[in-house]
Amino acid sequence: MPLLGDDFPQLAVSTTHGPMKLPCDLKGSWFVLFSHPADFTPVCTTEFVAFQKLMPEFEKLGVKLIGLSIDQIQSHLKWIEWIKEKLGVEITFPVIAANDSIANQIGLLHPGKGTNTVRAVFIVDPNGKVRLVLYYPQEIGRNMEEIVRAVKALQTSDKNKVALPADWPNNGLIKDRAIIPPPPTEAEAKKRLKEYDGYDFWFCHKSL
């Protein structure tokens, strides 16, 4: 199972858009891989619709979406067709038809839950590094806005070499400002509050 900072495992997979090799085929792009327990299930259907409706947001961020479950390609295609016909939403991202081996390799099988994949999310950066992992129980659908926020936060942190507070960009203390890394030396600590806004030398922040 890949952990934070690990290379995303090399996977050769079959998808509704044809064969893919991950993360090679997406090198240079951020991607969000999310697994769902099964096709033709209510919670998963609401999630697919929600992901699709946020596609413009993900595209603005340069992020590719990929779904995954242990279902056959034909099942995926029939389900996608049902979503379009009944709900009026066309699913445009690829969906992986995984097997037990692939699911086990990335930690998606939950003991005691049969062969259904768990509700997981992996955010992977352009270098193929795992940057965020989320797991949800089968009974609870994901918050897609939080996944978008997490991608924005990771990209902002990488670009500006800063940390970001709780509920960013709407933090109750410092709003949309970013937290500056701790000073590396005693001398830097002494002048930190003269150069930046903050509560103490270890808690300084700035606008981006």
Swiss-Prot record:
Substrate binds at residue 119. InterPro entries: AhpC/TSA, Peroxiredoxin, Peroxiredoxin_AhpC-typ, Peroxiredoxin_C, Peroxiredoxin_TDXH, PRX_1cys, Thioredoxin-like_sf, Thioredoxin_domain. Thiol-specific peroxidase that catalyzes the reduction of hydrogen peroxide and organic hydroperoxides to water and alcohols, respectively. Plays a role in cell protection against oxidative stress by detoxifying peroxides. Belongs to the peroxiredoxin family. Prx6 subfamily. It comes from Treponema denticola (strain ATCC 35405 / DSM 14222 / CIP 103919 / JCM 8153 / KCTC 15104). The active site is a conserved redox-active cysteine residue, the peroxidatic cysteine (C(P)), which makes the nucleophilic attack on the peroxide substrate. The peroxide oxidizes the C(P)-SH to cysteine sulfenic acid (C(P)-SOH), which then reacts with another cysteine residue, the resolving cysteine (C(R)), to form a disulfide bridge. The disulfide is subsequently reduced by an appropriate electron donor to complete the catalytic cycle. One of its GO terms (molecular function) is thioredoxin peroxidase activity. The keyword DNA damage does not apply. Residues 2-156 form the Thioredoxin domain. Homodecamer. Pentamer of dimers that assemble into a ring structure. Pfam families: 1-cysPrx_C (PF10417), AhpC-TSA (PF00578). Its main location: cytoplasm. The lineage of its organism: Bacteria, Pseudomonadati, Spirochaetota, Spirochaetia, Spirochaetales. It is found in: Cytoplasm. Its EC number is 1.11.1.24. The active site is at residue 44. GO terms for cellular component: cytosol. It comes from the Bacteria. This is Peroxiredoxin.
